Amino acid sequence: IDGYVEMPGRGLPPERFGGGRRDVRIGYGGGVDLTVGHGTVGTPGGLAALSLATQHYGRLPWAEVVEPAYQDVKNGFALSLASYTYLEFASRKVFGWNEPSFRALHDSDGRLRRPGETIWIEELAHTLRRIADFGAEEFYVGETARLIASDMQANEGILTFEDLATYKPIVRRPLVTNVEKWRVATNPPPALGGSTLTAMLLLMQNEPVDRWGAREVAWLARVQEGVLDYRLDNLDLSDDLEADLDRLLREARMGELKRWVSSPSTVHTSAVDADGLACSITLSAGYGSGVMPPGTGVWMNNCLGEHELNRRGYHAWSPGTRLPSNMAPTVARHEDGSVLSIGSPGADRITTAIVQVLVNHLHLGMTLGEAVGHPRLHVENHGGEKVVAYEVGLPVDDVRLPVRRFDGLDMYFGGAGAAKRDADGTFEVAADPRRGGGTTIGGR
């Protein structure tokens, strides 16, 4: 179910585009350039997608699904260490210019709240209560929609009430590939994440990997480099994204991609149940626009201001266009009936995190906990210069690119979460220690 952000601006004159922006640089992950402000907010679709999934596959009434979130916000929730780590870089430049946003994160003296301190957003509790009582439609055509649209129009935003009212999630046929005795399904175009993940999985199978020695780590880096090169050269500015993604996968399946190889505000939840249903959900607000429309308590996304996903330029998409995405929620089914759900936040580290966890678990036989907690690497692109960022514990002696070492597990490398139901009915779950994830096994 594709519930990703759309380009807004339906019915607006051309002169309304291009404004509402603040260009900032934050120190997160070694330095990130991004754009925030009302003009960076795309049409959010996550709530509509969750509603559709609940209608098709859920057992509980919608109000009961929303109730735990409502109670957490109503009673106040603790600021997590992972959130605080990001906010140390972003609280002023991203969230500090908008008064409701700043007030939610800082005390009366202007101090950023510390990990474990309680966050109170009373207006968000009221919004969740309306959504629980009246359905997801409240966000798109009700009072919440009117509050959001009004704030956008008053502050150079291009998100309109028509954009919200028109938004519909799309059910797409997933990309499916075989890994060992597993069939792995992930999200298809126009998202980039699922296709690049699938290409990496296919390429990793072209060379024997029975451990993470220096040769295998070097091959992993070359696979990431090759897919990154293909993306930069063919996908980010593509006029026919689906055709170019099809070519990527075709060449990866045939091994032809070797010619390419040789040369924080995202969350994920994975769940499986006793009936063998697996659910993988990734939602993103980008880095955050800093915007909290008065009366809503809702932080809005900055998906139009994520530079790596908008290489065509600011506001270059046509209204109604579904934006590209790095997200890759994934499910897999073994021939013995076991099911696995997996995904990760982490911007362009999403796919590289997932592929390494899948290789660790499906191919190398690690437990889910071992697979998620194993050191990772990620090939970065800095203005055309590639660098391999890696966590200590991986032998990088044979890697041909410059390297950037992290001395321990770091939230920069994503926050994978996985849940598995084995054929015998037992459950296995794992949450990434890099981002303070949590797990639970329960039932009704």
Report residues per predicted region:
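Active-site rim segments in enzyme catalytic domains, especially the processed small/beta chain
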Residues: 1-2, 7-8, 16-18, 158-160, ...
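Noncatalytic scaffold domains of N-terminal-nucleophile
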Residues: 1-135, 139-141, 145-184, 188, ...
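Short, well-structured alpha-helical segments that form the helix of a local strand-helix-strand
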Residues: 63-74, 146-150, 212-228, 368-378, ...
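Catalytic phosphate/nucleotide-handling subdomain of diverse soluble enzymes
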Residues: 136-222, 227, 292, 299, ...
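Short, small/polar residue-rich loop motifs at catalytic or cofactor-binding pockets
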Residues: 171, 263-266, 325-327
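Internal maturation/activation junctions in enzymes
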Residues: 206-284, 296
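Extended C-terminal subregions enriched in glycine
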Residues: 217, 233, 237-240, 275, ...
